[in-house]
């Protein structure tokens, strides 16, 4: 009986002293804004994350988090956690954008036919594309054929061929016809006028001569036969994909190195503190 009396008094005193502290702690946790960490520790120091960090020395601390987002443990390096998550988001966005860029099928691109064989475009466009692709062959052929055309017209003018009725017949403007009628330059101007009028025929002859010359040079082995356009596009897409993969690996390595450096700096600061 004597033993029970001090024990009962001790329990009453313990409840009287400790219950207000627990109630105050729970009320303080509810009034704090921001995420709170859940812990149940015995006689340890607990850090409560709120607008301000508070160190609490409690025999038993139980706080209820306002947000339902799970926290695995006390974040020993909160700065590193957010930095790592930010870098991972950037890396994933870069990977998705590069893969979306390189995932386009090469078959969707329109295949450009050989301009020497393409009859669906105008004569001038064919001449322009042929000049871009076979310029080294087209220029000599065009110069030779142009010289032949001009020489032929000049010879005809020397022989007294009157082109004025022909120009009037084809509907040439009167201003040009009058210049040829009253011109004192003679055969050269007449030959030049015929040379300009025959431009469509000259382009057609130039394209035909270029096609014949290209075939001849390829048969002799002086020009390489171009691969099919589809295979060419596939090869280009493979090269682009390899380059993008290498750049992605380099970017990933750099981000990993920066992350390791940041971890080292944060851990060093923690040790100093």
From Swiss-Prot:
Q: Does the keyword Membrane apply?
A: yes
Work out whether the entry's keyword set contains Nucleotide-binding.
no
Topology in membrane: Single-pass membrane protein
- Domain of life of the source: Eukaryota
InterPro entries xrefs: FAM210A/B-like, FAM210A/B-like_dom
Q: What is its main location?
A: membrane
Give TM segment ranges.
137-157
A GO cellular component annotation in the UniProt record: cytoplasm
> Which keywords label this protein?
Coiled coil, Cytoplasm, Membrane, Mitochondrion, Transmembrane, Transmembrane helix
Q: Where is the DUF1279 domain?
A: 118-230
Instruction: Tell me where in or outside the cell this protein is found.
Output: Membrane; Mitochondrion; Cytoplasm
- Region annotated Disordered sits at 97-116, 247-273
Q: Where is the composition biased (Low complexity)?
A: 97-106
- Biased composition, Basic and acidic residues: where in the chain? 107-116
Q: Which family does it belong to?
A: Belongs to the FAM210 family.
Known PANTHER family for this protein?
Answer: PROTEIN FAM210A (PTHR21377:SF1), PROTEIN FAM210B, MITOCHONDRIAL (PTHR21377)
How it assembles, according to the record, is: Interacts with ATAD3A.
Q: What is this protein called?
A: Protein FAM210A
Q: Which organism is it from?
A: Bos taurus (Bovine)
């Amino acid at each position: 009986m004597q033993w029970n009396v001090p024990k009962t008094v001790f329990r009453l005193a313990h409840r009287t002293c400790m219950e207000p502290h627990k109630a105050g702690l729970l009320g303080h946790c509810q009034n704090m804004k921001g995420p709170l960490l859940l812990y149940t520790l015995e006689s340890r120091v607990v850090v409560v994350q709120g607008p301000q960090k508070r160190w609490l020395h409690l025999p038993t601390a139980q706080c209820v988090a306002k947000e339902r987002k799970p926290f695995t443990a006390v974040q020993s390096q909160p700065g590193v956690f957010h930095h790592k998550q930010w870098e991972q988001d950037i890396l994933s966005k870069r990977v998705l954008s590069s893969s979306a860029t390189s995932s386009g099928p090469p078959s969707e691109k329109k295949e450009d036919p050989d301009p020497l064989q393409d009859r669906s475009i105008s004569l001038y466009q064919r001449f322009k594309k042929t000049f871009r692709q076979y310029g080294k062959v087209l220029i000599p052929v065009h110069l030779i054929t142009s010289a032949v055309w001009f020489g032929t017209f000049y010879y005809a003018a020397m022989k007294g061929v009157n082109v004025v009725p022909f120009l009037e017949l084809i509907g040439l403007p009167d201003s040009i016809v009058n210049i040829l009628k009253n011109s004192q330059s003679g055969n050269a101007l007449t030959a030049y006028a015929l040379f300009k009028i025959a431009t469509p025929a000259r382009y057609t002859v130039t394209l035909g001569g270029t096609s014949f010359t290209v075939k001849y040079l390829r048969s002799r082995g002086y020009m390489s036969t171009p691969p099919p356009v589809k295979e060419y596009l596939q090869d280009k897409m493979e090269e682009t994909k390899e380059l993008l993969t290498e750049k992605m690996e380099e970017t990933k390595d750099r981000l990993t190195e920066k992350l390791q450096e940041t971890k080292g700096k944060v851990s060093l600061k923690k040790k100093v503190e």
